[in-house]
């Protein structure tokens, strides 16, 4: 990834065992990459926080049902360390969603579907950031 010009990699805690997650984090950091470790539930959080995670993303999309709810981020927020970068991923639709997530301790959001389904992505992004 670094050779291809990437700045970061995504590591999904649900599909990596602890030692493999740790190994991939070490390799990423050693070549100058950031790593966004994605979690979906408390078990993923517990696994991820055993290692040197600097950026943690809570995916609000259930990978089995594909249903999305911001409640996933809100439910996990109190268990997440505030000294690392916290990202809420998926299901963010409004400026109010962003504000509520920020109030819950998240530093960043990952927005995809909401922008992709907009007729004018630029206008939709401006509305989210206004």
At which residue positions do the language-model features occur?
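Active-site glycine- and acidic-residue-rich loops that bind
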Residues: 30-41
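A structural alpha-helix within SAM-dependent methyltransferase catalytic domains
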Residues: 2, 25, 29, 49, ...
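C-terminal helical cap(s) of enzyme catalytic domains, especially alpha/beta-barrels
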Residues: 75-79, 102, 117-130
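Short loop-to-alpha-helix "cap/lid" segments that border enzyme active sites
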Residues: 16-26, 40-53, 63-84, 92-95
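Short, well-ordered coil/turn segments that N-cap beta-strands
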Residues: 6-7, 31-33, 52-54, 82-84, ...
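Glycine-rich phosphate-binding active-site loops on the catalytic face of alpha/beta enzymes
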Residues: 3-19, 57-66, 106-125
């Amino acid at each position: 990834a670094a050779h291809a010009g990437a700045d970061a990699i995504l590591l999904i805690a649900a599909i990596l065992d602890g030692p493999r997650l740790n190994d991939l984090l070490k390799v990423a950091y050693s070549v100058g990459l950031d790593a966004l470790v994605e979690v979906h539930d408390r078990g993923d959080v517990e696994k991820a926080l055993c290692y040197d995670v600097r950026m943690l993303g809570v995916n609000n999309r259930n990978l089995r049902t594909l249903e999305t709810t911001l409640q996933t981020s809100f439910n996990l927020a109190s268990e997440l360390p505030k000294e690392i970068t916290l990202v809420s991923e998926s299901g963010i639709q409004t400026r109010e969603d962003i504000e509520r997530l920020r109030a819950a301790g998240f530093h960043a959001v990952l927005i995809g579907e909401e922008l992709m389904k907009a007729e004018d992505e630029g206008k939709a992004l401006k509305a989210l950031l206004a």
